[in-house]
Amino acid sequence: MAGTVSLELDPIFLKGLGYLHSKSKDSAEKLKALLDESLARGSDSIYRNSIKEAEVSKVSLPKMTKQDSKSSSSSSASSSITTTSSSKSSTSEKSKKESEKRTLEKIRVDPGEGVEPPKKPRLEKQDSHSSPIAFQTKDIPIPDFTDIDETNADDFAMEMGLACVVCRQMTVTSGNQLVECQECHNLYHQECHKPQVTDKDVNDPRLVWYCARCTRQMKRMAQKTQKPPQKPAPALATTVPLLKDPLVKKAELKPKPETTGSFQAFKRTEVKATAASGNSSSSSSSSSSLPPGLTGWAAFTKATSNVGPSSTKLSTSQSGNSKTSPAASGSKPVGLSALANVKPALATKPSGGSSAGSGNGNNGSGTVPLKAPPPLTLGKQVLSRSASGDSLGKMTVTGSLSPGAAPSSSLGGNGGSGGNGAGNGGNSAGSSSSSGNNNNNGAKASADGKAPTSQESQLNAMKRLQMVKKKAAQKKLKK
């Protein structure tokens, strides 16, 4: 049986197996030679190639195990032989019979003819293997090599930073040297740079030179660094109300002392309290100082109200009738303040027609505007300041002297000695009135005489406070 099996097997296949299992170094070359001879058989080679392609997938695993056992040099060459051997071993008996016929044909062929044809296919095989390699080189590297050949020197110079950025050349002449920018480290020819570089910049021993692009960027950065200190200006503007707030709070906290320089309007709650106290104690505190609850403009109205009653007293004492008190109040500015003065005058009519009674009535009417409601005193203050000038101008307003009409009232005079007629009337009233009334009048006159000095001191204090506040606000803004 062994003899029959040996006859059925192809001798080329046996040779291939022998070369495959041999450990000699030439086994790979001999396997290549056998492969070339088998491929050079014409139609038989085509048939064998078809069988190889059909069964390559089936025998892929045994091929890998055999190739791993061999050396790396023989593995690439023996893979094709293993495909042929595996295909032949797996074919049917018909393929074996055909292989026997092929061996007979090979024997009939002359040895010279058998040697010559394999040489031709070897060349063809080499061409076939070299052709795809040639295509690969043409597809990928050949265009790259052409580009590199053209721009290799320029690119190398540019990468190394040895060439001009504009013209991409390294040529240097006496008037056209390469200058390096200290910021971006690019090289420029003196002529290539748009603002041409002068020889002074080239020969500068400090070697500090900046290109046009870098100079622009540096200018922009300098402007940006200068702008941030300018931007906080609105921040200072926003801090101004913050600075004002504590000043306002201080002004609101200061109404408690009697003399303050702030012109803030007082609160309604304080107004009601002062009005109630004024109505309750209308006949008392004739020559008292400024009330503690009044601040700002109310303090000025208090001072003017102290001046007003003294003049009305002089006029009423001259007429000698209690009915003249409404007329005296009529000499004052017409408005709500006049009505406020009329009510206490009417209340004093039942006291009698004597000069002493009129003096008492005037005392009552004089004390009411001291504690009058602040809105009324505000209006009165504005009118009296515009009409008489109060303590600032110290001007006197004189009216027509008639026994039935309103006599002259000296506003802002020296404490009761106004015009000549009013002064005479005051003297006659002092002689005709009782000693108690004279004492009251004297006290009021003395109080009225002190009023302008207190107003002047208030004005001076207010001016000083305003100046101090302005200076403090300016210092805070400067900080």
Curated annotation (Swiss-Prot):
Pfam family, one: PHD
UniProt subcellular location: Nucleus
Sequence ranges of Basic residues compositional bias: 466-479
Biased composition (Polar residues): 305-328
Region entry Disordered, spans: 57-140, 221-241, 274-293, 305-479
Compositional bias of kind Low complexity: 70-90, 223-239, 280-289, 399-411, 429-451
Gly residues bias (residue ranges): 354-364, 412-428
Biased composition (Basic and acidic residues): 91-128
ZnF PHD-type span: 161-217
InterPro entries linked: Int12_PHD, Integrator_subunit_12, Zinc_finger_PHD-type_CS, Znf_FYVE_PHD, Znf_PHD, Znf_PHD-finger, Znf_RING/FYVE/PHD
Gene Ontology CC terms, in alphabetical order: INTAC complex; integrator complex
Swiss-Prot/TrEMBL keywords: Metal-binding, Nucleus, Zinc, Zinc-finger
Gene3D superfamilies linked: Zinc/RING finger domain, C3HC4 (zinc finger) (3.30.40.10)
Function summary: Component of the integrator complex, a multiprotein complex that terminates RNA polymerase II (Pol II) transcription in the promoter-proximal region of genes.
Similarity section: Belongs to the Integrator subunit 12 family.
Name assigned to this protein: Integrator complex subunit 12
Native species: Danio rerio
Gene behind this protein: ints12
